[in-house]
UniProtKB/Swiss-Prot annotation:
The modification Phosphoserine is found at residue 134. GO terms for biological process: cell division; meiotic cell cycle; mitotic spindle pole body duplication; mitotic spindle pole body insertion into the nuclear envelope. GO terms for molecular function: spindle pole body-nuclear membrane anchor activity. Interacts with sad1. This is Karyogamy meiotic segregation protein 2. GO terms for cellular component: cytoplasm; half bridge of mitotic spindle pole body; meiotic nuclear membrane microtubule tethering complex; mitotic spindle pole body; nucleus; old mitotic spindle pole body.
């Protein structure tokens, strides 16, 4: 039969006044006593760290007084072992003089009560149960009473006959004795039945104590698991708080980026609207120029027709030339007019004809200028569709608008200043974007530290 360490008796040694409570300062001594009585200890019950933490706790709470159950709970939390189910070393137990507990460990008070009930039961039963040799349940048989058949034959009752004893009284006493014996037998059967019931109840009590003990152990196990789950939940809560803070930082960064994108889109939209307005104005101007060109072409055609008619008219009615006058010849107009030629008119022409020729030449020059202007607009439209926003066009426009100094030294200084400003702008934009995006080459630089404010989680 297994024997276990009497934990309650060890605790009771530190309670001389039998108050049921001991000081917390005796906890480590109790643990050492239990460790000394253990069977085949592989390692001490408390390691250095647990013992140091227990000493610190006892030092801070030296005035605390705890009960035996609280001592057991503290022992279970520190060691993870049930103090009532530790096997005992019999040799060490004899040396210390503490009685072991057998079978399954039970509370000491319940075991003593059960033993007292059993002792009382068997002690009472020894007096109630009748002896086999005596039908009257008495240690000394009543030999003075005999049956009716033995009355006359027994010599021991001769003095009764001589004294004229009453036979009826003897018969009544005998009947009363038999009645009491029957009652005693019935009571004996009742006592046996009660003994059986009591034994059954004791077995049920033992099983209930076993179930209570297992429930207590299971409750301690669940309490330990609950403490571990509570500790894990605290760690998860701290991690969740950290993730929430990082999420808020990411949200703030996203909001700032959205504002920046919105500002860029707004600026781009403004530029697009401006370009659309300029393109619409250019289209309107081009349409107006085309309309004016068509009108001028119609006028030119009409003038050419009139010119042809006038040429034929002058050819028919032209006067004979003088002898000293140069022959009839065609002369070109001095101002540019690639469309037609006006014939030579002699000096005898009228004033109206000279005015008409001057107006015709003016119209021709205006038509030529309008055509040149239309060609320039067509070339400008073709270039604007391809390289209006190209860097070369922007630079050429910028340099065309900037008035550069004539001196060579001033030009060199000006271009050097532009180069330095461009290098600074490129450095700022490049490393600013690289810092936000956290490109790996930044970690190679000695003066650059890792920034984890916007790191993804």
């Amino acid at each position: 039969m297994d024997e276990y360490i009497p934990f309650d008796d060890i605790v009771r040694q530190y309670d001389p006044d039998y108050t049921g409570k001991v000081s917390i300062q005796a906890f480590l001594e109790i643990v050492d006593d239990v460790d000394a009585l253990r069977l085949n200890p592989e390692a001490p019950l408390l390691d250095n760290e647990q013992r140091q933490s227990a000493q610190d706790f006892i030092k801070d709470n030296s005035e605390i007084v705890v009960s035996t159950s609280e001592i057991k709970n503290l022992f279970y939390e520190l060691t993870g072992l049930d103090p009532d189910t530790l096997p005992v070393n019999k040799l060490a137990l004899r040396e210390n003089g503490v009685l072991p507990r057998k079978s399954v460990a039970k509370p000491q008070k319940i075991s003593e009560n059960r033993i007292k009930r059993k002792d009382m039961f068997y002690q009472d039963a020894s007096y109630i149960t009748p002896r086999k040799g005596s039908p009257l349940s008495h240690s000394t048989p009543l030999s003075m009473f005999r049956t009716k058949n033995e009355y006359g034959s027994n010599k021991g009752f001769s003095h009764i006959n001589k004294e004229n004893a009453d036979d009826s009284l003897i018969q009544q006493l005998y009947e009363r004795i038999e009645l009491q014996a029957a009652e005693l037998r019935s009571k004996d059967e009742q006592v046996k039945e009660l003994n059986a019931r009591n034994a059954k109840l004791l077995e049920e009590l033992d099983s209930s104590e076993e179930a209570c003990k297992s429930c207590y152990t299971q409750a301690k196990t669940w309490e330990k698991k609950f403490r571990e789950a509570l500790r894990d939940s605290k760690e998860y809560a701290a991690q969740l708080q950290t993730i929430h803070e990082e999420y808020e930082q990411q949200q703030a960064h996203i909001v700032r980026m959205e504002e920046l994108i919105h500002a860029v889109e707004k600026e781009r939209k403004t530029e697009t609207d401006y370009m659309k307005k300029e393109s619409l104005s250019e289209q309107k101007e081009r349409g107006a120029f085309m309309e004016s060109n068509m009108i001028l072409e119609e006028k030119v055609a009409h003038l050419q027709l009139e010119n042809e008619q006038l040429r034929l008219f002058f050819k028919e009615k032209a006067p004979q030339p003088f002898q000293n006058h140069p022959p009839y010849q065609n002369l070109k107009i001095t101002f540019p007019s690639p469309f037609f030629h006006i014939p030579y008119i002699p000096k005898t022409e009228t004033l109206n004809d000279s005015q008409f020729a001057a107006g015709l030449s003016l119209l021709a020059s205006e038509l030529e200028s309008q055509k040149n202007l239309l060609k320039k607009f067509e070339n400008l439209k073709k270039k604007s569709s391809k390289d209006f926003l190209s860097p070369s066009t922007i630079l050429s426009n910028a340099f065309s608008k900037v008035s550069l100094p004539n001196s060579l030294i001033l030009r060199v200084l000006f271009f050097s200043l532009l180069f330095i400003i461009g290098i600074h702008i490129f450095y700022f934009l490049f490393f600013h974007v690289a810092t936000i995006q956290q490109w790996p080459f930044l970690f190679w630089l000695p003066s650059t530290k890792f920034d984890n404010r916007w790191s993804p989680t």
